[in-house]
Each structure stands twice: as C-alpha cells, then as structure tokens.
Amino acid sequence: MKLKPIEVAEILQKEIANINCLSELEEVGQVISVGDGIAKIYGLANVKSGEVVEFKSGVKGLILNLEHDSVGAVIMGDYSKVKQGDNVKRTKDVLKVLVGKALLGRTVDALGNPIDGKGDIVSKEYRHIEMKAPGIIERTSVSEPVQTGIKAIDSLIPIGRGQRELIIGDRQTGKTAIAIDTIINQKQAHSLTNESDKIYCIYVAIGQKRSSVAQIVKKLEDAGAMDYTIVVLATASEAASLQFIAPYSACSMGEYFRDNGMHALIIYDDLSKHAVAYRQISLLLRRPPGREAYPGDVFYLHSRLLERAAKMSEEKGGGSLTALPIIETQAGDVSAYIPTNVISITDGQIFLESDLFYKGIRPAVNVGISVSRVGSAAQIKAMKQVAASVKLELAQFRERESFSQFGSDLDSATKAQIEHGKRLVEILKQEQYQPCPVEEQIVSIYVGTKKYLNDIPLQKVKEFEKAMLAEIRLNRKDILESIKTEQCITEEIEQQLKAFLENFVQAYCVVP
C-alpha cells in the first residue's frame, strides 16, 4: 500500500502536534567535599537555607550554611553513598513530614518513614517540620489539666494543657518513667467517647539506645497505650542530622492534633542530646563556637521548638499541644548552659534528685525547687482543697528533720510534725507504670493531710493505702464517682469520706 505525499504530511503534522516538548529546568551543583555527614556543594546559586537537596545516589540533604561561593548541607541518611564530584539537584522544597491519625500506633524515623515492619502509613497530609509558633491572639491561657497519674506531680506540680513543663535530673533518676506513666495514664480518657477528654501522645527518642527504646515501645504496647501514641526515633547510631530534625518532625505531627481542635502531649527525650547533635553539626559546618562549644543560636534551637506548644483560642478550635521536654544534668548541676536555657523557656520544672532516688523515694521529685508556673489554674478544685497545705508541710518537715540530726532532745510537737512529714512522704511514693486515677489520688492525699495515718506504723503506710483504696473501690465507689463528677469536695462528700475513713482505720488497727 502506497501512501500519498499529502497523507504522509498529515501523519507527520499529527505526530508533531502530539509531541510533549516541555523541558524542565533543573538547577544542579557539585559536591566539592564530603565527610562526617556534611557536604560542601558548589554551583547552587539560588538555593535557600532549610531547602532539601537530592544527591546522585538518591540520599537527601538539608541546606544549613550559605557561604560566599558554596553551600553546606547535612546529609540525612547514609553519607557513605555521597562522593566528591557527585551531582546535587535542588528540590525547591523544604523538609516535610507525614501527619495524621494514621500515624497512631506506629514507630517512625525522623523523616516520618515507618520502621516497625507494619507496612506503609496511609495518609495524604504533609506538614513542614519548621512551623511558626502561634501568635498571642491565637492563644488562650492554660485552664484544663493533664493528669499524669503521679500523686507527687498532680497534687504539687500540676500540669495544664498547652503548658511546657521541664523534667530535669541526673541519669537514672526516673525522668523517662514519669513521661511513660503520663502516656499510660491517658488510656482511661481514650476509653471515653468524648473527643475533648482524649490526649494523643507523641514520644520522641533522641540519641537513646535502641534497646531502651524497644523496652519503652514494648511497655506501651503491653499497657494498651500505643493505640493513641506515635513513637519517633532518632537513636544514638543514627546521623546527627536526623537527631537534630527528629523533635521538629514530631512537633509537626503534634500540631496536626492541636490545629484540628484535639489535644496532644509530646515528650522530647531528651533535649540535652539534641543540643549535642546540633553542636556537632555546627562545629563541622565551621560555625564559631560559644560557651561549652555550643553555637550562638542554641537558645533559639530550643525556644522555636518549645514555643510551638500552646493552648489555642476557641476561634482557632480550642486544641492544645503540651510539651514535656527532658534534660539530663551532670551531678545535679542545673546551672549549666543547656539546663538554664530550657528552664527559662519552659513554664516550670520537675526536678528529680539522685539522693532521693537512692533513699527509695520514687518518683524522686524535689518538691522544694520543682515548680509549675501556670498549672495551678488547670488543677481541679478537689485536688486544690486537699493538697493546698502539702508543700508547706513537707518544707517544714525537711527543715525540722535536718535540725533533728544535731540533737535528739526534741519536744513532742516537733516529733509529731516529723512523724507526720514522714507519712506524707510515704503516701506520695508510687511504683513505676502504676498511674493512679485523680479521684483516688485525692482520697490518698486527704488521708495523709488529715492525720489518719498517725496511728499506722511507717512501714505499713503503703500497705494501708493499698487496702484502703481496694475497700473504697469495692464498697464505696459512690464517693469516688462523686469526686470525679463534682470535681470538688463538698460538705456532703467530706462527711461520707470521714465516716468511711474513721470506720476503716478503726477496723484496720484492730486486725493483728
């Protein structure tokens, strides 16, 4: 079959019309040096600070330094795949992370990729990891409580939704234990249908051992807490760049809940290692070192992260993001650079002491220097009523106890005060992974402050508390329910509680 010239011309015209010759302009640079997770790149004249670039091997990098004739990038991943002379292209985009409820129950890395072997995460929503903190008009004051389930904290150092409360102390003093107990304690609220009672949790492990994190994830799974928790990992074996961006990625995940009228709690464990990772990056990028070799902007590193925790106004949905940053001190030195920085940014601190921990007082909270600057506005009235005098009584007890070491010749009133103080300390002790509902905490502290324990031997106080709570749960659940619904101790509730306690103490003391 012969084609006529006119037909050939028509076919050619059709094919030419269908050709898609849209060319995409790419800006490409070249790696001039690479080492220790840092790449120096030449030829990216229009690249921006904080922009993501892609290396020839597919590994991503983050631009942090803009110099006269080159740019410095941190490599996010295996930097052994990046070689001198490799091409680098701009993505014209900043770092983003996957957000949404699909992440709940999952363990992800600093870039939001799942690492728990449970398959892909189905979510279409992404957020920038660096977001501007809400302004003054968008916020409202802290007014709702975050119940940690820990008596010493909920009674004396209350935490509110939208607050930043620092947990600070030496290694092995129970900092992570407080954070994990707080996550586990949210399970009761998640069993309710009311969305405003629920608090979604995010745990960020920065520079931790993989074995430690595996234990934490196992504990959360066993307690049924992973259903409402996201775990973000940047362990000690990972690049400093991933340890640096992990808290910002996790914060964006938390902001999804905050900005959609929900409530979230984020735990940064810990920001000391985060600052060390940033110091490492800064020194490798040849930035001038300052105090303790940290760069000049190390305060801004943490302030821009923690300022994103907020209680939003009703116009903005009324959601909240509460932050519990953790800082590890060396030999109890809270006046070091990073601890003082974070103390000044946060709304209070829970200070844990090694001496108390070794004495068996756990949680090892030093009530004297621990403080919550805004949490008292969120504390429920019933707790305020019973715990109002506890801090003063404990302070007086510590003073008299230290005084009693110099001589045994004490008057009966001082001896009684010391004995009462010892029982208060005993009632505030709590075992790990056993958070206590707020109504039961109120009853326990009421027992301690109203001197019902005076006739109970010190070594039997915990046993007495356990038996008393078991009895009230079994036979007088109505008292607990009344405290829970009323959220204050009315005269009627107090009469019922007094009658129950008098009968129980009498019966308990009779039993041999």
Curated annotation (Swiss-Prot):
It is an enzyme of class 7 (translocase). GO terms for cellular component: plasma membrane; proton-transporting ATP synthase complex. InterPro entries: ATP_synth_asu-like_sf, ATP_synth_asu_C, ATP_synth_asu_C_sf, ATP_synth_F1_a_nt-bd_dom, ATP_synth_F1_asu, ATPase_a/bsu_AS, ATPase_F1/V1/A1_a/bsu_N, ATPase_F1/V1/A1_a/bsu_N_sf. Signal peptide: none annotated. CDD domains: ATP-synt_F1_alpha_C, ATP-synt_F1_alpha_N, F1-ATPase_alpha_CD. Its EC number is 7.1.2.2. It holds the Pfam family ATP-synt_ab. SUPFAM superfamilies: C-terminal domain of alpha and beta subunits of F1 ATP synthase, N-terminal domain of alpha and beta subunits of F1 ATP synthase, P-loop containing nucleoside triphosphate hydrolases. ATP binds at G169, D170, R171, Q172, T173, G174, K175, T176. It catalyses: ATP + H2O + 4 H(+)(in) = ADP + phosphate + 5 H(+)(out). The record marks S370 as: Required for activity. Belongs to the ATPase alpha/beta chains family. PANTHER family: ATP SYNTHASE SUBUNIT ALPHA, MITOCHONDRIAL. This is ATP synthase subunit alpha.
